[in-house]
């Protein structure tokens, strides 16, 4: 099957796979971030009790862990935003795909015209 495909068809198929993997990565990334956020939210509900503790070291460690978790989650969200900007900025993939499809459609129309013309001439 691949032997019969034109270069344009192969390029289009490769670009389609690239877009699909970007979309899948985006979806997985967002689900992971949402899950991490929910876990953090559950832990934060128990933090006030720990912070009320009289044990200074436990208090300090709790605050340190909470701060670290918030930082890591915010970093992941920043990375996610950057990833989405990259995918959006890479809309040239979509533009290229549309151009490829247009060219392919035009080529098929030209092929049909040539076939009709050649039949009339023969």
Swiss-Prot record:
The keyword NADP does not apply. GO terms for cellular component: host cell nucleus; virion component. Keywords: Host nucleus, Host-virus interaction, Transport, Virion. Signal peptide: none annotated. It comes from the Viruses. It is found in: Virion; Host nucleus. A motif (Nuclear export signal) lies at residues 10-19, 86-95. GO terms for biological process: exit of virus from host cell nucleus through nuclear pore. Interacts with protein M1. May interact with host nucleoporin RAB/HRB and exportin XPO1/CRM1. Mediates the nuclear export of encapsidated genomic RNAs (ribonucleoproteins, RNPs). Acts as an adapter between viral RNPs complexes and the nuclear export machinery of the cell. Possesses no intrinsic RNA-binding activity, but includes a C-terminal M1-binding domain. This domain is believed to allow recognition of RNPs bound to the protein M1. Belongs to the influenza viruses NEP family. This is Nuclear export protein. It comes from Influenza B virus (strain B/Lee/1940).
């Amino acid at each position: 099957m691949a032997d019969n495909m034109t270069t344009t068809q192969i390029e289009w198929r490769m670009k389609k796979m690239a877009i699909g993997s970007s979309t899948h990565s985006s979806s997985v990334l967002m689900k992971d971030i949402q899950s991490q956020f929910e876990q953090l939210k559950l832990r934060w509900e128990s933090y006030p009790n720990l912070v009320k503790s009289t044990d200074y070291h436990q208090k300090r460690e709790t605050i340190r862990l909470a701060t670290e978790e918030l930082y890591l989650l915010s970093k992941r969200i920043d990375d996610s935003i950057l990833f989405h900007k990259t995918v959006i900025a890479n809309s040239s993939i979509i533009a290229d795909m549309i151009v490829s499809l247009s060219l392919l459609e035009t080529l098929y129309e030209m092929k049909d015209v040539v076939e009709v013309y050649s039949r009339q001439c023969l």
